[in-house]
Amino acid sequence: MKPSLLSLSLLVASQITALAVVDLGTTAGQTPYDPYIQPVKQTLNSLQGSAPSMEKVKALMSKGRSFRYAHTEPYTAARPEVTAARKVGDCKDKALWLCDELDDKNVRFVIGKMSRSEHVRHAWVMWNDGAQWWVLDCTLNFRPIPADKVAAGDYIPLYSWSKTGTYRHSPTSNLLATAGKTKEPVAAKGKRRS
């Protein structure tokens, strides 16, 4: 009896994990990052394509991961062509470069936290291949991560931008009172992300 109860518990747990919801946020009128997000909006507005192949995504992530990490500007991402030419950038720069290279009009540029305990903001890309959402973080990873497989306390989105909108994610409900007061840069000088 106990082995079948254990088997049933494992089956239920795996089904719950398989049904994990990806936080795509709700439409936001404004964010604390609005004064700094112009390069992101310009790049996203220029995207015309649709979902590239997974092989192309993996190749781009590997290329972006090979760019040297250097924190330059705390809030504003470098234009993708600057990051490509220098082969250097922080998480914002690499994420925006990746958005541009993907040329997928449905991609999302995300600002959030790597984990609940982090104080420094991080940037990455959310991408849908037509079947599911993926976390693309070429600052820290060589390969895409299925968004529904990310641990509950990791890759916590706060705000995201797409060609068609700006989104606030559930963790920001506690941040709304201080929305105009944030001084947290996206990436931090001296904190090297391998």
Each language-model region and where it sits:
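Bacterial N-terminal signal peptides that target proteins for export
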Residues: 1-8
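N-terminal signal peptide c-region/cleavage motif recognized by signal peptidases
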Residues: 13-15
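A structural boundary/capping signal
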Residues: 18-194
